[in-house]
Amino acid sequence: MCSPTTENNNNNNDHLVQSSDPNHPANLIPALCAKFWTLGWVTGTGGGASIRSDDLVYLAPSGVQKELMKPDDIYVLSLAAQAQSLDKRQRVYLRSPANYKPSQCTPLFLAAFTKRNAGCCIHTHSHWAVLVTLILETQGAGKDREFMINNIEQIKGFGKGFGKSGNLGYHDTLKIPVIENTAHEEDLTEFLEEAMDKYPDTYAVLVRRHGVYVWGENVHKAKTMCESLDYLFQLAVEMKQLGLPWVTDIEPTVPTRK
Amino acid sequence: MCSPTTENNNNNNDHLVQSSDPNHPANLIPALCAKFWTLGWVTGTGGGASIRSDDLVYLAPSGVQKELMKPDDIYVLSLAAQAQSLDKRQRVYLRSPANYKPSQCTPLFLAAFTKRNAGCCIHTHSHWAVLVTLILETQGAGKDREFMINNIEQIKGFGKGFGKSGNLGYHDTLKIPVIENTAHEEDLTEFLEEAMDKYPDTYAVLVRRHGVYVWGENVHKAKTMCESLDYLFQLAVEMKQLGLPWVTDIEPTVPTRK
Amino acid sequence: MCSPTTENNNNNNDHLVQSSDPNHPANLIPALCAKFWTLGWVTGTGGGASIRSDDLVYLAPSGVQKELMKPDDIYVLSLAAQAQSLDKRQRVYLRSPANYKPSQCTPLFLAAFTKRNAGCCIHTHSHWAVLVTLILETQGAGKDREFMINNIEQIKGFGKGFGKSGNLGYHDTLKIPVIENTAHEEDLTEFLEEAMDKYPDTYAVLVRRHGVYVWGENVHKAKTMCESLDYLFQLAVEMKQLGLPWVTDIEPTVPTRK
Amino acid sequence: MCSPTTENNNNNNDHLVQSSDPNHPANLIPALCAKFWTLGWVTGTGGGASIRSDDLVYLAPSGVQKELMKPDDIYVLSLAAQAQSLDKRQRVYLRSPANYKPSQCTPLFLAAFTKRNAGCCIHTHSHWAVLVTLILETQGAGKDREFMINNIEQIKGFGKGFGKSGNLGYHDTLKIPVIENTAHEEDLTEFLEEAMDKYPDTYAVLVRRHGVYVWGENVHKAKTMCESLDYLFQLAVEMKQLGLPWVTDIEPTVPTRK
């Protein structure tokens, strides 16, 4: 067989992951994942991160120890080539590392890149994210599909939404949709895309009993929103333990300036 | 236009942030912020730190990843030049980094420098600070404006107050005022200044659902008081979870020596 | 006497622990233990790790500070020579470090190597493991001998069992047997072996009020399963504090694909 | 005046703190304190550590940031010279750093060295130690003066007592006396010494609402016992939150071997 995939795998385009620039995606993904490991976000090979640079998408492989990843471990995929693929489940890798399998998170990362034009997508298994979805579960169907919190300063760390300028305000209510987990991570894709359609301004989707996907225009925005969200999830769990509500009705004490 | 600001921005005084001394403010702010990031104080670009050296004030920009800051990212401002500005909200920067915006915390840091002659001011979004203000909120208006704790050894980490020598004693009650958060961080300034007037001896002000501002005569004192305060906030939350009161009436068992 | 043991101890085979390869077991055990110390798994000389490479078993000594261990501190033992020993409690070391005693965990590590053909075995004193056994203890005899959790994504981090390919699924229930602690760690061995016989697919055994033993085909698998398990133990304790059950009956929302 | 103190201060014996050996006390105290800072044991200049080498005692100064200490900051004192001093509160320093004051912990460290022949003494302000003393306080006078825990493996990390060989067993009950805090740290000395007399086998004394002092024959033993104790304090607080008792009556399941 002589498909582009096979050809590319043969000469394998190793130059795509070789750079002395610490901000090159192939260097940045391992550095980010090592940092995320210390935060408990990518424990035991769970979770991960992907970066898009124009048409190219850089992806960590399946099942690696995230704090030990190397640039040589990174997959590279072309969005344009992928779009031309007849089978949506078939990936067209420009570069594949030896001895690895692609991550099951790949179609979820691609959804953020193609539907939201994101430059980076992070997936964590953070305890706080999982606990928030478990706490919501006890509130009965209907109320359990949305995490809401307001009147916390850290909410300002979020943009107003895709294609909108500016960030949320202190009195705004941050809403993060929750989707149910599926037996196979790839099967989450359609539910993630549905949530993106229903919540066009969200930069994150919680996955019940699993974790969270967070994306942003670039690495900086995806990472800082992921940190802010994890902060809010942790705070929400601690508030629950102290019997404090996540949403309150506080009147602005000072008129909001434009 | 030919104002000093524009002139200064043109030649930009980069020498003000270039030093091989690790204790130079332009080197120290990034080092401190990297350390604070590991403590969870400046998650997701929240929080920050500012240092004053005689007339010059060194400030981190808005929206940066605090653990990745570099000396080149630092703003420098002259207190004397600022005092002559007709518009209090207009900042007169001697040096501005490219591609950044000044931090909204700037007027709050300046309040500590001008009203308290502080040499350093730290602003954290620590969970423990936020949780303490949330717990106080449940105690009803009137009781919710002051964090109080006594009979804990770590209280000795605080000075007696601005212009006074010596530290608090074990049996003294540490009181930290709480101000309400505002939609825009700059609008906090007048409330912070009010709290400084009402509590002339305090080295810190809590901001409801937001975090804490802590200052001191120099970096050493601001940092160690901020650590001691965060320790006490964490202890207070843990005491609350265990049903233990923050203020107790313990008689000294040994006569206090002078 | 002129036994192989004595001979080997005399010339002591130091070459067995000298390698410039960071993945050599004598280098890897100290690096792993330093990492585990930061996770709170091997506090105060407790816990440890052992690696098997073909016939050779590499072991940390008793009572060392795990974050300060050096390759020179490592014991080496031959499984073949050990199998020929008449006294099962007598160890036949090819290489012994000066000034140390062998670890009491040795026979437990050997059980994982000989009965499960493991390539690595990790023993932690993690708080979360101990707390899980304490919580189970309150559920009465009969129910206290097995930790069970299901419908959490991280469960997928576990293999289906010794000699089976593939990992557990999201809806599978992870079961970890609990054995009672004994006054002497060596006396745990027979109970650990019994649990291995009763739970042929398990990769871990909890020890009541003590910690956990986790093994795997190689270092990668043992370490990532140990991380996943610690994540689940922590989650289980947090779920208990929030009144959430560890085992739930959730129907798959999407047909499971083969 | 021409006392030995003054003389020694003049030539100041800087050689006593200058060594290229990382295990020299003047190098080891800063390294240990930096590690303890990351554990939350010496937050905000609280806590510290002292090492004795034969007649010489090495001490950190008062009020320093413990993670930034340098060998040049260390005080050195002679036990023999100290013993000849007429005023017990007067310290006879062989070497004093410039611009510092001696630590108020000094007489407490000296008590461990002179009354227990310790080689190292560590003082932490760990949250867990403070919380344990607060929890005990709620149990009423009489029951509040002793922390007790048993049937936890980590108890084996403690020696049987001063001058005795071997460690505690799994079924032994670890008992740590609690003394009341005093307004001045130096005033704790007599109560610490009383507790040492009443509990001749203990290697630690808790100080109510303050922290813990832990000592050992050498640095290794003091540090690992301090780690084990902090582990047990943390576990005890977590057990309290889960409603689990610290002391239980478990019969050995296997006959204890000699």
Curated annotation (Swiss-Prot), chains A, B, C, D:
Residues binding substrate: 105
InterPro entries associated with the record: Aldolase_II/adducin_N (IPR001303), Aldolase_II/adducin_N_sf (IPR036409), MethylthioRu-1-P_deHdtase_MtnB (IPR017714), Salvage_MtnB_euk (IPR027514)
Molecular function as annotated in GO: methylthioribulose 1-phosphate dehydratase activity; zinc ion binding
Active site, renumbered: 153
Cofactor entry: Zn(2+)
Keywords: Amino-acid biosynthesis, Cytoplasm, Lyase, Metal-binding, Methionine biosynthesis, Zinc
Renumbered residue ranges of the record's region Disordered: 1-21
PANTHER family named in the record: METHYLTHIORIBULOSE-1-PHOSPHATE DEHYDRATASE
HAMAP family documented for this protein: Salvage_MtnB_euk (MF_03116)
Role summary: Catalyzes the dehydration of methylthioribulose-1-phosphate (MTRu-1-P) into 2,3-diketo-5-methylthiopentyl-1-phosphate (DK-MTP-1-P).
Protein name: Methylthioribulose-1-phosphate dehydratase
Taxon lineage: Eukaryota, Fungi, Dikarya, Ascomycota, Pezizomycotina
